[in-house]
Amino acid sequence: MPSLPVLIDTTTEFDVSSPQNVTQKRSLLLAPPSIAAHEEKLRDIFTTFDRSVTDLQMLDRLSAGFVTLPASTYDLVLVLTDTNGARRNEALELLTRDIFNILTPSMKPSAQLQLQDGPFQANEGREAILAGLVEKHGAFEKPQYQEAAVPLRFGANKRKNKISPEPVKIESVGFVDNYDDDELINEDDLLDEEDLGKPVQQPAECQPETAKKRRRACKDCTCGLAAQLEAEDAERREKANADLNVLKLKTDELNDEVDFTVQGKTGSCNSCSLGDAFRCASCPFIGLPAFKPGEEVRIMNDMAQL
C-alpha cells in the first residue's frame, strides 16, 4: 500500500496572549476670551489634537467658577497664546491663584503645563510654584508623590531590664511641735519682794569707752542709759541757747555808735567795714554796704545812717 503524504498545519487557531490596554493621554486646552472671535485658529489647533481626548475651556469661565474640571484626568495642559505670542500677556493675567487651585487637582502626576508660544519666563511662574508645580525645561510639572508607610517605634530601645534603684533612706530629724499645750511662765512670778528691791545692775556692755566713741543706748534700753543721755542732750541745748542769747543785741544797743577812729572801739573781728563776706555771724552790720574805716555809722530803726 503506498504511503500518503501528511500535511501539518502550524498556524495557531487561537491567541492566548492578553490584550494590551492602551490608554490615550488626555489634553486640556485653556483659551483666553479673545480667541473666541477667531474660529479658524481653533480649527487649526484641533488638527493637531484629537477631539476625542482633548477638552477646550475658556480661562474667564474657569476663573468665574462656571466650569468644574475632573480630578487627575489630564496629562497635558496647554495655554493657547498663539504661536507668535500675541495673546501671551492676556493669558498670563488670567492664570491667577484661583485658576491654579482648580487646575492643579485635575492634572495627573507628571502632567505638564505649557505655553503655546514657548517656555515660561523667570518671573511668570510664581503662581504655578505656589500651587505645587515644579519647573522643568521651561514648563511646569506636577510632581509624582509616593506614599510609603514608615513604622514608628516609640521607646523600643528603652524596653530593657532595668534594675530598680534602692530607695534612698531619708535621715529623720527632730520633731518640733509648735502647737503644744505648754503654758508660758510669767517671769515676774519668779521674783520675790527681796529680788524686786535690789538695784538694777547696769550690764558691762552698756558702759562703752567714752574716750573713743559717744555712748549710745540700746533701742529697747531698760538700764537707764537712754534717759541719762537724753537729759545730757537737753542740758547741752539749754546751754547753747543761753550762749546765743548773750550775742543778741537789744533794741537800745542797736542805736550805739561804733567809731573806728578811736582805738579800742572796733568790732571783735575787725572786719565790720569790709562787707558781709568778712563780717562774723553776730555782726550788727550784716546786710549793710561796706563803708570806710573812721566813717560814722548809726543804725537807727534798722536803717544804716552813714
Curated annotation (Swiss-Prot):
[2Fe-2S] cluster binds at residues 206, 218, 221, 223. A motif (Cx2C motif 1) lies at residues 269-272. GO terms for biological process: cellular response to oxidative stress; iron-sulfur cluster assembly; negative regulation of hydrogen peroxide-mediated programmed cell death; negative regulation of nitric oxide biosynthetic process. Residues 21-150 are annotated as: N-terminal SAM-like domain. A motif (Cx2C motif 2) lies at residues 280-283. The keyword 4Fe-4S applies. [4Fe-4S] cluster binds at residues 269, 272, 280, 283. Its cofactor is [2Fe-2S] cluster; [4Fe-4S] cluster. InterPro entries: Anamorsin, CIAPIN1, Dre2_N. Keywords: 2Fe-2S, 4Fe-4S, Cytoplasm, Iron, Iron-sulfur, Metal-binding, Mitochondrion. It holds the Pfam family CIAPIN1. Residues 269-283 are annotated as: Fe-S binding site B. It is found in: Cytoplasm; Mitochondrion intermembrane space. GO terms for cellular component: cytosolic [4Fe-4S] assembly targeting complex; mitochondrial intermembrane space. Residues 206-223 are annotated as: Fe-S binding site A. Residues 151-196 are annotated as: Linker. This is Fe-S cluster assembly protein dre2. It comes from Talaromyces stipitatus (strain ATCC 10500 / CBS 375.48 / QM 6759 / NRRL 1006).
